[in-house]
Amino acid sequence: DSYGNETIEEVTFTFIEEETQEVKVNSSYSTLDEVVAAVLQDITDNSMSKGQKARAIYKYAHSKIGYTGNSYTNSSEWQDEAFEALKVIKKNGYVAGDCFTYASVDRALLDGIGAECIWVDNQGARSGDHSWLLCNLGTGWYHFDSTRMRSGFSCFMKTDAEIQAYLDQGNYNYVRTVSKYPATPTTPYTY
């Protein structure tokens, strides 16, 4: 400072480089369907509409997965990623992964409530590749992505217009070849 005082602290940092953090978890779940059923039993009930169940799935994945930029497993199959990630969440309450982890868990749980899903990939955007879903709960296709966004954007059942408004703010996560996918309804989703 201006009086000549100084403080010195010694700090040690340890950096661990890893491509994936996959750890096979011993669990009583032998199939993806079994762990999906267990999670859905925890977060939904029969009194809920399909939209309410989808919202519970969104909140579950959004809060139980932390973004690291690396998938949880080395597998390129979403079913493998979802199975391993969900087992870890059931055991530890949390798992780290990337958009592939979020989309895989979203897809498995949405399939479990009977929703239709289409996988969407954003290839080559400035922010890097990104994956999310188009989801149809019976009222048309909407964008569904529980990935935590730096901007705080919540992508629960968004229309194409809502996604475009997000893109117009300078965000690139959802750039895609629009003609490859079904159009969403023009009205925001309600449940």
Show where each model-derived region lies:
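Short, solvent-exposed loop/turn segments at the edges of extracellular beta-sandwich modules
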Residues: 1-5
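Low-complexity, Pro/Ser/Thr- and charge-rich linker/hinge segments at domain boundaries
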Residues: 17-27
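Secondary-structure boundary elements
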Residues: 26-92, 186-189
